[in-house]
């Protein structure tokens, strides 16, 4: 079985609520850290989410 091309990453909220999303990314095409503006239900607004490793 071949190694998967995508890796799972965790998108952690910068609002310090502890909320996170889990998503996939292709490390060959996206070499830099991912930052996305998404909705944080604990803060009840759209905030920036930054990439972190899944432990």
UniProtKB/Swiss-Prot annotation:
SUPFAM superfamilies to which the protein is assigned, alphabetical: Zn-binding ribosomal proteins
Gene3D superfamilies with a match to the protein in the record: Ribosomal protein L33 (2.20.28.120)
Domain of life: Bacteria
UniProt key word Lyase: no
Pfam family, one: Ribosomal_L33
Gene Ontology cellular component terms for the protein in this record: cytosolic large ribosomal subunit
InterPro entries: Ribosomal_bL33, Ribosomal_bL33_CS, Ribosomal_bL33_sf, Ribosomal_zn-bd
Biological process terms in GO annotation: translation
Keyword tags: Ribonucleoprotein, Ribosomal protein
A GO molecular-function descriptor: structural constituent of ribosome
Family: Belongs to the bacterial ribosomal protein bL33 family.
Name this polypeptide is given: Large ribosomal subunit protein bL33
Gene symbol of the encoding locus: rpmG
